Every structure is written in structure tokens, then in C-alpha cells.
UniProtKB/Swiss-Prot annotation:
This is Piwi-like protein 2. Disruption phenotype: Mice exhibit blocked spermatogenesis at the early prophase of the first meiosis due to transposable elements derepression, and apoptosis occurs subsequently. Female mice are fertile, while male are sterile. The lineage of its organism: Eukaryota, Metazoa, Chordata, Craniata, Vertebrata. Its cofactor is Mg(2+). Pfam families: ArgoL1, PAZ, Piwi, Piwi_N. Disulfide bonds: none annotated. GO terms for biological process: germ-line stem cell population maintenance; meiotic cell cycle; negative regulation of circadian rhythm; oogenesis; piRNA processing; piRNA-mediated gene silencing by mRNA destabilization; positive regulation of cytoplasmic translation; positive regulation of meiosis I. Residues 666-957 form the Piwi domain. One of its GO terms (cellular component) is cytosol. Interacts with DDX4, MAEL, EIF3A, EIF4E, EIF4G, PRMT5 and WDR77. Associates with EIF4E- and EIF4G-containing m7G cap-binding complexes. Interacts (when methylated on arginine residues) with TDRD1 and TDRKH/TDRD2. Interacts with TDRD12. Component of the PET complex, at least composed of EXD1, PIWIL2, TDRD12 and piRNAs. Interacts with MOV10L1. Interacts with GPAT2. Interacts with Tex19.1 and, probably, Tex19.2. Interacts (via PIWI domain) with BMAL1 and CLOCK. Interacts with GSK3B. Interacts with TEX15.
Amino acid sequence: MDPVRPLFRGPTPVHPSQCVRMPGCWPQAPRPLEPAWGRAGPAGRGLVFRKPEDSSPPLQPVQKDSVGLVSMFRGMGLDTAFRPPSKREVPPLGRGVLGRGLSANMVRKDREEPRSSLPDPSVLAAGDSKLAEASVGWSRMLGRGSSEVSLLPLGRAASSIGRGMDKPPSAFGLTARDPPRLPQPPALSPTSLHSADPPPVLTMERKEKELLVKQGSKGTPQSLGLNLIKIQCHNEAVYQYHVTFSPSVECKSMRFGMLKDHQSVTGNVTAFDGSILYLPVKLQQVVELKSQRKTDDAEISIKIQLTKILEPCSDLCIPFYNVVFRRVMKLLDMKLVGRNFYDPTSAMVLQQHRLQIWPGYAASIRRTDGGLFLLADVSHKVIRNDSVLDVMHAIYQQNKEHFQDECSKLLVGSIVITRYNNRTYRIDDVDWNKTPKDSFVMSDGKEITFLEYYSKNYGITVKEDDQPLLIHRPSERQNNHGMLLKGEILLLPELSFMTGIPEKMKKDFRAMKDLTQQINLSPKQHHGALECLLQRISQNETASNELTRWGLSLHKDVHKIEGRLLPMERINLRNTSFVTSEDLNWVKEVTRDASILTIPMHFWALFYPKRAMDQARELVNMLEKIAGPIGMRISPPAWVELKDDRIETYIRTIQSLLGVEGKIQMVVCIIMGTRDDLYGAIKKLCCVQSPVPSQVINVRTIGQPTRLRSVAQKILLQMNCKLGGELWGVDIPLKQLMVIGMDVYHDPSRGMRSVVGFVASINLTLTKWYSRVVFQMPHQEIVDSLKLCLVGSLKKYYEVNHCLPEKIVVYRDGVSDGQLKTVANYEIPQLQKCFEAFDNYHPKMVVFVVQKKISTNLYLAAPDHFVTPSPGTVVDHTITSCEWVDFYLLAHHVRQGCGIPTHYICVLNTANLSPDHMQRLTFKLCHMYWNWPGTIRVPAPCKYAHKLAFLSGQILHHEPAIQLCGNLFFL
């Protein structure tokens, strides 16, 4: 074999699956979909119509053919068949929510909503439906259907955008309101199949709902634009019918054809999945039709029965509208990749970095407090010109001895795209014992090699016939007959291309600058891209007709509302205080005035390799100069020169010094270049094995004399925090308050176990913090873990203040909308149960869910165009959720791109905090992150929890030592 090519075949043991499949070769078993959770309201919140008074008996649904809400979602590509319960009996802590709460000044009535049953597949209409499995979030539906000219197949539609990929629960229930009571139809006229009667007078039946008080008043009004386009619904209703074929017609395409033959009855605007039919017009209650089966000339009776009348703006119609809009995007020649649509023909090529950038859109229809909107965001897909095979060759050249291990380490977990079908897959493993010359069995029972498959189906000639195969393991799902499908999808490295930004490129400032110039659009450019999309829809007759046929129309521009700019906050130092400037940056003040609390650093050690001696001395000299202004006393360190920069040298030397000198306050290490392995080894030693605050400094950051002063100031402030110092604070009017931040890191290299970061304030000014880490295994209960964290923080609070907090505010990061109700009664009761550890202790509690990965953009309306809003901009109406008390806050200064706010959902409020108090407190906490003298996107405890969880999960793989929990050692 050529010595420059990697030796792919090897003795690595492999455990092949019982079923090996290729994408596209199993027509009856659709490809797996990775659902993303949306942000619209939940299914089953629509309006239900009822005739005012009618003595006729109510319409009885057909018992055999299960219809209603479940059938509706089944018709849209959603599998509602029974699924066995997941092994995970307890919802994972990651990306969940702490619960749903209400302001104490709200009037709330407990109500029960009937849950629709999940029918067994055997009682549903027969057919070889190609609908793929999906799970229902609040506004997400997935599936796949076949395309016909006059029929809009339902399926594989995502009704909301997400920036992340979340795993669905193993089973779900759909909540619906009472089915409508429809009057008995008059006798069917043989001459008229359409209803000639005037539309029935329908009254909206809505269960009593609490009034959500969510609007504040503090701040300066501002005119804002949003990346939402108002949608008007012109139809009276959307009518759902159940279609029965007698005798049964098994072939789905044949059922499509038979129904298509009766367009004179149904009209040419239909959406049909084989059993459920949606029309914008109302037919008679029951319509009987006849068709002739072409295969055997048998006469088939078709019965179309009205089952549901859906109000156009109801939540039940939103998934359906997203199907329609997805069809519109396809008519614009946009290619679906993942959940978004892209235009590969307009790709921007960065040849010097071997990258392509595909422009596109992420779009979904959602219902908010302001009505029905299209949420459209500009999206970019970064595609590398290098195939996975090219990456393998490069790895082989660098490390032939450990080639397979290095390949697996780099590739597993990566997302690749196969350009022959524009589908993305996550690499779960590499099969070193299989090559394209191996064969697999297709769904029709025929055996074919991978070489033959790609040549026959895509006209692709595979050049490398001894390359290994990539393994993608889709989640378990059911086919159309309720059978559980398992297996692996095998991909060719030669035909799979890496996506995303390479890690090496992320550390290249110039490369990232070139990339961000292409993908970070200004508000004016972002608005222009949305205008371009609206123009393309209006100018494309087929696309605009697709919306018009269903009674939908888009406004010609983005929606404009009024927001507020919150007042600027006062920053408090030891001897001075000041109001922040408009750009919310106070780096000058914190480096020339004394911090609130500084810890003298008398016993510290500096470890450095011999070739970094000059940089080490310059750093210490600068630290001594700048320590005075911030009020910190610093003594000369114990100088420890290392003979080399090997990991063993650092670890052995640090251990020996810590063993001799028991009073070391801080370990400072200077390392040569970016060394993740060395950094991890030092942190494991200092955070787990021999707990001591540590600071690791890259020699490059202190190698430029012109920047040394500013770098040294940041280093010294950070070291003060790690020793237990306090830098600055803000005015907190709430007394006896504890603030908690929680975030979750998922460790992909260790079975996707979750690492929970928990950070709580333990003094009255919110400047002293207590932290804990919880490692959560997939099947492990978290009751004891949360109790350990919260009870420990309450005890620390009592030690500092000699009392327990009266109010506790929790900011829970890492949550998607699809899991709000799933975990609503799971984490909050656990937190509240912790109070039982103290006698007669019942504090008031407020819980916020913090969502950063959202697609909502804010524009500030300038005289001639949109600009970036100022920090402190808040929106608490129109775009807010119909179900929760929530608001959007842009707290940080945006230097590039659009203003993407953070979404805060209040899920519990027993402290009676008003909307103004919620928003002001949240904005204040965004000033309290001591790693940056300015505001950040999320409250400081959330950011601290994120840093802690990342360090523990990515670097330490272990809980930090308890001795460090009282300081911010993880900064």
C-alpha cells in the first residue's frame, strides 16, 4: 500500500448491528429526523366551536377509525402509536425547566384538560404511510410525505426554529379540548355536494383562563422592529375530514389518485395523508363517492366525513400552516438541510480557508400575544471543502501510530453533510472493518454493494474502495405498522463533508474575522435579507398562490412595536460609585479604583519553563505596579523554573512544592502556546487532587509589551476573585435575597452524562458565591443531588448572615420550550422539598427559565433604517408567549451583527415580584459577571454556573474539591 495513505483496515474490534441500512434504500422505513423544539404554544390550545343551541344529537365519531386530534397530527407526519416507555424513568436534568409558575396577584383556576388517547396502529386506517416518527413540541411537527401536483402532502415540517438539537422524550401525550358538537346534516342532495347553507353561527368555547400580568412601565419608550412578519387568516375555518375507503385500499398512492379524481367535489386545494383530509371549504356532513380501482376494476366506495372545524388562528392549525410554508420555501428552490432552508447556488466561497457558506433562512409560524406571525431569521451553513476522507488522510500524516484513535476522537460527535441528498448526520462511530466493497440488503431483499448503490442511485463513482465506513445510529422509532426499527446508517467518508467551523480555525483571529464578516449581518442587512425573502414569495406566483389557497397572507414588512430602555445601573466599588455609560463598559474605573474586597497575596508560586523566564519577570513586575490602584497587596512569588514544558514536569514540581509549602494561596503557571492537555492536567491537580486556586497563562498573551498592562490587570482581578475577593456590585433593593444560577453541560465523550453547575449568592449584596457540581448519570435520580446543593448553599448563607433568605430567585439555563411541561412538576418540587431540612422555613421563590438560543432579533428604528438597540432594551408584549409570564431583554452591548435578546420565562412567582421588579433585577444581575467589566447576555449566576459545569465536564471529569466551593475558582 502507498505509504502516504492511511492503513484503514485494522484489528479494532467491531460489534455490527443486526441491521445495516443506507439512506434512501428503504422506502417503507423513512430516514430518522432530529426534531428541534419550537417556541410556539402547545397543541390543544385552539378555539373549539359549538353551535349556540341545537337539540339534535351530537356528532359521534367513527369508533373504528380513530380521528380527532391524534389523527390530525398523524396526518401531518406525527407518529402517535403506542411506544414502550423509555428506560429513563426520570426526565434528564439537562435542558429541562424548573416548572411553571404564576404571579401571586393572578387569579388562577385549576382545570383539567382531557388527553386524547394514543390509538393502536391496528385501529387506524390501513396503508403504507411513509410518515416518519417525530415528537411534538409546542410548535414542532416532523414527517415526510410524497409530493403530488394538486395534493399537498403533510409531513416533515418543523413549526419553529431552534438553534440547538434536543432529544425528544420517548413518548408523549397530546392535549386537546372537547371535540366540537356539529349539527346533523340535512338530507344529501344528489345535485349538490357542497354546502349551500349559509355558514353556521359558531360560538367560540374557551375555558376560563387566568390573566397574565407581564407588562412593566419603567424605562424610556423606544420604537423597535422585529424579525416577525404578521400573518392574516382570511378563511373562516379549516375543515378536517376523515376519509374511508371500502373495501380497504392498502396502497397510499392509489388512495391519493382516487381522491384526486374527485377534485370537482373537494376542489383543487387539499391536504391529504391517506386518511385525514383538510380543506378550506365545508362539504356536507357525509359525502359518498365512487371510484374504480384500475388494477382489478373493483368499485371502491369513498366516504368523506366531517370531524373537526378548526379556527384559522388556533394552535391546532399552526403545525399545518408550517407544512404549507415549508412547501412555499421548496417552491422558491431552497434546499432543506437539517431544519432550515439554504440556497447552495448562492454559496460564498472562502477559498483561503477551504470553506463554503450557504445563505438561507430559518422560518416558522408561531402564535404569540400579538397574534399569528412568521418568525424568519437569516441562517448560514458553513460547509468545508474537505471531505471526511481528506481529514483522515491529514490525521494519518500527523500521527500514523495512533491513527484510528485520533480519527475516532476527532470525528465522533461531528456533524457531516452528504451533498448527494443534502442531509446531515451525526457520526457516532467508525467501522474500520467495513469498506465500500461490502454489501448490504435493501428493503426489497436484494443485496448490493455500497459501490454499486451509489453508482446506480446517484451516478457517483467511489474512488477509494478501501476506506472505512462512518456509522450514524438514529434513535429508535416505529414504522407505519408499529414495528420498532433499529439499525445503523453507514456513510462513506469520501462522500461526507464536515460542517461547522474547525477548532483550529476558531483560534485563528484572521480566519474568524473573514468568516464573521460574511455571516454577522448588521440590522440593516438582516432586514434587507428578510425583505428579499418576502419579495421572492410575492413575485413567485406559485409560492404566493400556495399561501393564498389556504387563506394566508403575509404583511409586506417586518412587525414594529414599542419597547422600553431600562434605566442605567449604579456600579459600586469600595470607595466610589458611578452610573454606567451608554456602552456599559467600566474597565477604566475598576482598574484605577479599589475593589470592594481584595485578598492579600503573600504566598504564591510561579511556575514557568526556562525559555519563558523573561516574560515571567515582566509579568510579576507589572502585577506589582497595578496592584496598588485596585487596593491589593502582593508579595514576590516563589520562583520555580522548569527544565522543560512536559506535563510530568509541571505536575511533579507543583506537587512537590504543595507538599512542602502548605500555605500556598495561588499556583500560577506559564505555559508555552495552547496546550489543552497540559491545561487539563494542571486544573485536575489544583481543583481535585490538591485543591488550591490556580491561574494558567499562555505565554503569548503576555508576550506583547504594548498589551501587557491591560492583560496583567485582567489577570490580577481574576486572581483576586479566585482567592475570594469581590470586585464590584450593584444596588439590590430586595433584602435577604438569594440568587441561584443553574446550567447543564452534556459530556459527549462519556455517555452523554449531564454535569450540573450550581452557583448561589450567600451574602446580602450578591457579591459572595457558593458553588457545587452534580454529575448526573442517565438513569440516576437527582433529588439527593439538588438537595445537597441547595441545602449546602442555605447553610453557607446562614453562616455569613446569621439568618436564612426570605426570597430565593433561581435562573435556570439550558432549557427548551418542548420540555417546559415535562419537567414543570419535577425540579421545582425538589428544590422546595429542600426547605424541609430547616424548621418552619418557607421562603418565597421565583424561578426563571433563561433561553439564549432563540431566533428573535430586535432592531432600533432610526430615521432611515434599522440599527442595533441599546443595552437594556426590554420587550414584554406582542411577541411574548400566550401561556407564560415572560419578557425579552437585550442586556449586552452588541458590537457585531443584530441584537439577539435573551428570553426569560417566569415559571414560578410566589414572591409577588411585579414585571418591573423581574426585569430590573435580571438587568442588574447582568452587570455582576466579574470576568468582564460590562454587561453580558445572561445574569451572572447563570454564567458562573455555565463556566463551572464546562470546567467540570470538559476538563476535570470530576467534582471539584469541596474546599474550593466558597470561591469563584473556575473563572
